[in-house]
Amino acid sequence: MSENEPVRRRRRADADRSRTAILAAAITLLDERIDAGMERIAEAARVTRQTVYAHFPSRDALLAAVVDELTRETMEAIDALELETGPALDKVLALIDLSWRQFEQHPLLLQLPQSAGQDERHGPVVERFERLIRRGQRTGEITRELPVAWLVSALIALGHTAGEAAATNRMTPRKASAALRTTATRLLQEPASRP
């Protein structure tokens, strides 16, 4: 090992800590105010603006990293739901509830402009919904009248619609969440089991 190796490791650890602090500060500030600037984020992270730009060359790059971090956290929470056990429809609703809680906890997610990477970020969530819906169709809990891809797209669109309704104060978050659950249930249930 060279004499410089411990110094390099220390610098890397410092850089990792700075990046983590910047992301945490950005998430907190952007949840409060979507137009929070890089200077304010640097202050909250207790780093210089130059350090922020060293990690994230633009505000768009920082926003993308924030969304990536929140997506990672969400996927960890989704995987903890143990989607392979229990009634499929119940698990779909649990997944919707978890996603809704993420939107409530991080309002910035509802305020960000649509990005080119959004479909890519939705990919893991889409895959979980697809597995659940296929399982539910096999067991007869979920309608077979509509294709899996259509049902997943409809669920995601409903989630975005509910989020937008809450974000623009057309509905309270509680009513939007209830409407989302009711609509999702009606969409997915076999016709014979609908109320």
Q: What do the PLM-derived regions correspond to, one by one?
A:
Residues 1-6, 94, 127-139, 164-195:
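C-terminal peripheral helix-coil segments that are non-catalytic and often amphipathic
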Residues 94, 114-141, 146-157, 164:
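Amphipathic alpha-helical packing segments from all-alpha helical-bundle domains
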Residues 65, 76-104, 116-118, 122, ...:
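Hydrophobic alpha-helical connector segments
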Residues 56, 61-70:
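Alpha-helical DNA-contacting segments of helix-turn-helix folds
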Residues 46-56:
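Short hydrophobic/aromatic patch on the recognition helix
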